[in-house]
C-alpha cells in the first residue's frame, strides 16, 4: 500500500500510476474484507450446526466458544472498516488539497469530509490541464465509491435481527456516498451499479434494474452492470414462470383461442389490471422487461404490457405512485431500447 500511495501522490499523472487507486482497493482493502467475511461465514456455520465431535468439553461450552469467535471476527471486521473509512477520507482530502480541487468541496462537505484550504502552487498548476483534472475527478469518484462499499459492508455486518429474526438494513450512509460519487461525474456508471447492489439487497428489484440501466447508458458505462442485469432478469423470468399472473395470461390466451365468434375475437386478450401492492406491480414490470430483453415469450409480454399500462393509468388517477416512479419507468424504458 505504501508503494501504491507513493505512486498516487507523487506520480499521479504518469502511466505507472494509472488506476493505482483501484489496486489499493482490490489488493489491500477488499482482500482483507473478503478474508474476514469468509471467516465470519464459516464461524456462523459452526455456530448454527450443533457440534457432533467427541471431546471432553461439553457441547454447550464448545458452541459458546465458537459464538465468541464469531463475535470477535465481527468486531475485527467493523474495526477494520472504520480504519479504512478514515484512510480513504484522508486520501481524498489530501488529493483535493494538493491539487486545489475546490469545486469538489460541495460534494465532500455533504459527506462530512473535512478539507483544509492549503495547497501547493506547483501541483495546483499541473492540475489545471483539463485531462489531468478529469483524471483526478475519476480517482476521487472511485475513492468515494469505495467508501460507499465500506459503509455497505458495515451495515451488512452490524444490523441486528429483530425478535422475529428479521434483519432490516439501513444503507443511508452508503447510498449517500454513491449518490455524491455520481454527482461528481454523472457520465460514469460505477456508482449506479453499486446503487443497484443496494437495491437488490433490500429487495427492490425494479430499483436495481433501473440503476443497472443507468450504469450502462452513460458515456463511461460500467461493463459488469450488463452481466449483473442479465442475471437479475433471468432470476425475474424464473420467478415469473411460476407466478399466478402468468397462469392468468395462459388462461386468457386459451380462452381467446377457443372463441368461435369472429366478432368477439381480439388480437390480444386481457387480464386483470390490478395488483395487490406497488411492490408486486414493479415486480411484474421487471418480469415484463425480462420477457422482452431475453425474448422469452413476446406473446405473454404483450398481454402483460397491456395490464401494466392500464394499471399505471389508474394509478395516475388515484395518485398511487410517486413522481420518481414515473421517471424511473420512463428512463428504464428508454435505456432498455438503447441496450437491447
Label every model-predicted segment.
Residues 162-234:
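Internal alpha-helical scaffold/solenoid segments in large eukaryotic proteins
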Residues 8, 40-41, 47-48, 85, ...:
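A conserved position within tetratricopeptide repeats
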Residues 2-64, 70, 74-77, 246-340:
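Extended alpha-helical solenoid scaffold regions that build the rod-like backbones
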Residues 207, 224, 234-258:
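Extended charged low-complexity segments that act as oligomerization/scaffolding linkers
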Residues 87-140, 179-185:
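Flexible helix-coil transition and linker loops at the boundaries of alpha-helical arrays
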Residues 33-56, 62, 69, 85, ...:
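Short coil/turn linking the two alpha-helices of tandem helical-hairpin repeats
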